[in-house]
Structure formats: C-alpha cells, structure tokens
Amino acid sequence: MVVEVLRLGHRWGRDKRISTHVALTSRALGADKILFVSNDDHVKDSVNRIVEQWGGDFKFDVVDSWKQYIWSFKKNNGIVIHLTMYGENINEIMKKIIEKRQEGKDSKNILIIIGAEKVPKEAYELADYNVSVGNQPHSEVAAIAILLDRLFEGSSLYKEYPDAKIKVNPSDRYKSVEIR
C-alpha cells in the first residue's frame, strides 16, 4: 500500500511552516509522498533535507491539476480520503476504510486530501470518504497525524530507516543520538 498526501490551497509565503509540518508529519507517520498544487522551494528543501538526514524515500511532488490527479488515482483503484471537520467521525468510519483498503488481492493505495484554505466543493465530491478528526477547528497537522496513526494501526510510530544518518536511541534519562 502506498499512501500519498495532497495538500490543497498552500499559500506561498503564508503557509510555509504549517505545510512543512504537514509534510514532515506525513513522512514520520508512514506516508510515502506529499503532493502540492504549486511549488514552494522552502517546503521542498526542508522535506528533502529531513529525508537526507533521517532516511527513507519520502517524495515531494507538484501536480498540475489536482482534480485530474484524483481522477487518475481513483481510476487506478485507489481510495481517496478528504480530511475535513465536516466529515464523518473518524471513530465511526475508520474500520470501513481499513476493510476497503484490504479488499481484493492487493491492498489499495490511499490518497489523503488536506486543505490549507477553503477546500473546493469538488474535493468533497471526488473523495470516497470525507473524514473528520473532531468537529472543532484545529490544526491540519493534528488531523493528518491521527488519521495516519489509525490507518497504520500504530505501526509507523517507531519506524526505522536503514539509510538514516541520524538515529534517536530512546532513553528515559537523557538524549541519545547516533550519527552514522
């Protein structure tokens, strides 16, 4: 299963920090790629620097048409999840999503849509699932973290990358970092 995150509405200059955090959280919790509808070299460079130091093959990409990308993704039997505070409760829909993902011979790829500003109506219509992580305003970073943790059932929290140049050794008393 491949998990991609599509960031809609990134506002260049205004959303650099939060979009970087969405990307890094996506990577840390198991996603394979983040897609933007416009390029932001600051975000791209930050993501690539983290991957270089901390390992893995997480990708940053830009799509010309987000609608076309979603259509193509769905055509290839992928599942599209839109994170929105107006969607179905994650506690009630997650089991159904996991079952759908495992349906058939191969597990299905997943595309998660996450907005920065008001998300166009078409995103709601194109999504297979409109999912809420609570019905109160909060950070999209929190929403993507919770969804990915539920999707991977906690297995991505302590994932190790063999090509990492930096590795944290958990400790209850002090910082322990291994530089390779």
UniProtKB/Swiss-Prot annotation:
Sorted keywords for this record are: Cytoplasm, Methyltransferase, S-adenosyl-L-methionine, Transferase, tRNA processing
Classification via SUPFAM superfamilies: alpha/beta knot
Q: Its domain of life? A: Archaea
Record-level GO cellular component terms: cytoplasm
Chief localisation class: cytoplasm
| GO process terms (BP) | tRNA nucleoside ribose methylation
Q: What's the catalysed reaction?
A: cytidine(56) in tRNA + S-adenosyl-L-methionine = 2'-O-methylcytidine(56) in tRNA + S-adenosyl-L-homocysteine + H(+)
Gene3D superfamilies from the xrefs?
3.40.1280.10
Keyword Cytoplasm appears in the UniProt entry: yes
- Family matches, as InterPro entries: Alpha/beta_knot_MTases, tRNA_m1G_MTases_N, tRNA_mtfrase_aTrm56
What broad class of enzyme is this? Answer: transferase
EC number(s) from the headed UniProt entry = 2.1.1.206
Localization terms from the record: Cytoplasm
User: What residues bind S-adenosyl-L-methionine, as annotated?
Assistant: 83, 115-119, 133-140
Q: Does the keyword Cytoplasm apply?
A: yes
Q: Tell me the GO molecular function terms.
A: tRNA (cytidine(56)-2'-O)-methyltransferase activity
How this chain assembles, per its entry, is: Homodimer.
Family per record: Belongs to the aTrm56 family.
Please describe what this protein does: Specifically catalyzes the AdoMet-dependent 2'-O-ribose methylation of cytidine at position 56 in tRNAs.
Q: Which PANTHER family match?
A: TRNA (CYTIDINE(56)-2'-O)-METHYLTRANSFERASE
Query: What's the protein called, per UniProt?
Result: tRNA (cytidine(56)-2'-O)-methyltransferase
Source species: Methanococcus aeolicus (strain ATCC BAA-1280 / DSM 17508 / OCM 812 / Nankai-3)
Lineage per the UniProt record:
Archaea, Methanobacteriati, Methanobacteriota, Methanomada group, Methanococci
